[in-house]
Amino acid sequence: MRHKPHFEDSYNENVARAKKALREYLDLKGIPTVIHEDYGPDIKAYLEVFYEVEIKKGWEGDWNENWDTVRIPARKKRLMKNGRRVVFWVMNNDCTQAFRVYSSEMKDEYIKPVPNKFVPEGELFYCLPVEVGAFISLEQ
């Protein structure tokens, strides 16, 4: 396959401007970056990601196919303030299976009151359709 020749002066002039513009944009989004010249990708980004875990005591073994939602307490919304990236993991009782969902999928439209023994009038939960996340086996 043919491609244009590499013009070092043009490359140096343009790539520096492009890297500067993208790094400024990523900085505004709170994504730290570093430039490492190794003829690989131009910019290496470091995303800060947090993980929140819960155990669903009533979930034994494989996921019950009759359960069409996974519940995560709505009070966990505080963990996502200021655009913080959080990956939520809801595990079965023996921690061999998990449901993983990204904070970007945790929409307010999923918040609903769910009565339980601790809050009979209904505690607020994200009632997430299983399609918005993924089931992961944690067995080695």
Locate each region found by the language model.
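Nucleic-acid endonuclease domains
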Residues: 1-50, 55-140
